[in-house]
Swiss-Prot record:
Entry keywords, A to Z: Cytoplasm, Isopeptide bond, Metal-binding, Nucleus, Transcription, Transcription regulation, Transferase, Ubl conjugation, Ubl conjugation pathway, Zinc, Zinc-finger
Organism: Homo sapiens
Region named Interaction with CCAR2: 1-200
PANTHER family documented for this protein: E3 SUMO-PROTEIN LIGASE PIAS3, ZINC FINGER MIZ DOMAIN-CONTAINING PROTEIN
Known pathway: Protein modification; protein sumoylation
UniProt motif (LXXLL motif) ranges: 19-23
UniProt-recorded Gene Ontology molecular function terms: SUMO ligase activity; SUMO transferase activity; transcription coregulator activity; zinc ion binding
Notes concerning its domains: The PINIT domain of PIAS3 is required for STAT3-PIAS3 interaction and for translocation to the nucleus.
Binding positions (Zn(2+)): C343, H345, C366, C369
Protein name: E3 SUMO-protein ligase PIAS3
PINIT domain segment(s): 115-280
Chain spans, region SUMO1-binding: 450-460
Subunit (UniProt): Monomer. Binds SUMO1 and UBE2I. Interacts with BCL11A, HMGA2, IRF1, MITF and NCOA2. Interacts with STAT5; the interaction occurs on stimulation by PRL. Interacts with GFI1; the interaction relieves the inhibitory effect of PIAS3 on STAT3-mediated transcriptional activity. Interacts with AR, PLAG1 and ZFHX3. Interacts with STAT3; the interaction occurs on stimulation by IL6, CNTF or OSM and inhibits the DNA binding activity of STAT3. Interacts with MTA1. Interacts with CCAR2 (via N-terminus). Interacts with TRIM8. Interacts with PRDM1/Blimp-1.
Amino acid sequence: MAELGELKHMVMSFRVSELQVLLGFAGRNKSGRKHELLAKALHLLKSSCAPSVQMKIKELYRRRFPRKTLGPSDLSLLSLPPGTSPVGSPGPLAPIPPTLLAPGTLLGPKREVDMHPPLPQPVHPDVTMKPLPFYEVYGELIRPTTLASTSSQRFEEAHFTFALTPQQVQQILTSREVLPGAKCDYTIQVQLRFCLCETSCPQEDYFPPNLFVKVNGKLCPLPGYLPPTKNGAEPKRPSRPINITPLARLSATVPNTIVVNWSSEFGRNYSLSVYLVRQLTAGTLLQKLRAKGIRNPDHSRALIKEKLTADPDSEVATTSLRVSLMCPLGKMRLTVPCRALTCAHLQSFDAALYLQMNEKKPTWTCPVCDKKAPYESLIIDGLFMEILSSCSDCDEIQFMEDGSWCPMKPKKEASEVCPPPGYGLDGLQYSPVQGGDPSENKKKVEVIDLTIESSSDEEDLPPTKKHCSVTSAAIPALPGSKGVLTSGHQPSSVLRSPAMGTLGGDFLSSLPLHEYPPAFPLGADIQGLDLFSFLQTESQHYGPSVITSLDEQDALGHFFQYRGTPSHFLGPLAPTLGSSHCSATPAPPPGRVSSIVAPGGALREGHGGPLPSGPSLTGCRSDIISLD
């Protein structure tokens, strides 16, 4: 009961900040006014007074009144009424010394002030910094020292001084390296580190909030802030050592001063230390890792057997295990396979790439399982070293239940390579062949080049007109022949007869062509071009033609967009057509559709024009003007 009364007295002397810390530590609501917080704290003390809560109350009270802690005997004296003596005291009551009274008892309400400054933290606590793999410590310039904070102000300031010995100065100067851009760097550096003031385990680097550092009166650059993880969060700097060598006085006679400013936090203290270190490279760490030796392959085989051992309680059993020989970091073949002792997987990563990545940004995280993989726990796997030396043509292996392995070669699927289809101006035409072997038909391929003809060739060498005799019967299709793919300059079914009449260029140039507008839009560069000027170099020949396909009729229909042809256009052709062609050309066979250009000037049968009544054109066929 005496201890409970002592704890109650301690709680009643707390301020709002101590009450909030106590309630937050116990997981209770810490919002409200002081009397509400005090009632919650007393209820906590009566309901569940756990040992951790009791220790927290005593810790807060020691921080609140660091000089004197009241004991049970002192509390009994304070509980007696004035002028009375305790039981068994023969003499009169002696006055209670002021040091035994709590500061709150000497002052009235609302006059709570700190009568004594808080007890300073130890200057050199037993704080040890966690060693950094890329730095080798040569000397300790400032031992881990507490950044003392007072409750009187928000921002704190501390001053430190250190000096270099002549030997240390010589080491720093001889390690200077000139870098591109008129900069210099030192392999041996003066390193400043911050951490939490905790003695339970080696501490990692940790910056106080709102930190500012001045070395010899010059502001020291600090690592940039990390992006906040959530909105409203206070930005933090990445915790890493600070190189203050460029700002230090490299002299054995002049000391160096450090001024640190930071924001104090309730219940959290920080520590500062300065070291003389030598910076190492990834290659040096790789050599040190090789010097540690290669782990026995039997360890990995035992791990494989353990993973592949069948579980009697499980219905699914793993009989094999595939492992890649490619590094998950660089996607290249492993050269120095390593992994951490804390990793439970067999997959290894390349030690050289892992060290190079941590040299740029020290995270020391396993790329396979994303767990911590510090440099001290890295080992080189001897089993993978044997596999890499004996199997150089595969990138994946498979482990068996007995610890053996076999290479996994990729399956090569035979794929037929199809020739890409030809797109362009050049085309192929298969000529029909009668009978014969089908293999010979495939070999006979005629390649047609559509780009050999140009306007310049036409102007230099005008094409000669070929005249063919008129045949009255249709050409029968060859038996067994395939379809013919036709393109420009292919022999068509239009057969020409010898020239029967000529027509001068002056006649064509005098035709009133403006009466027949084109049925399709023409470009501006073609509208002003005289197309008939190309036809005046040679007189045109006319002859009867036999149209043996409906496609050519449609082509002529698009060529003659007009239906009624003026008599003055085809009038001069009537005598020639009537006298020479009608008697020489026999009538078309039944079922053959032909287009006849009559003197009356109309396309018949195929184009729906009126038929002439004269007997002179019976059985005659029209002449087609050949422009090629």
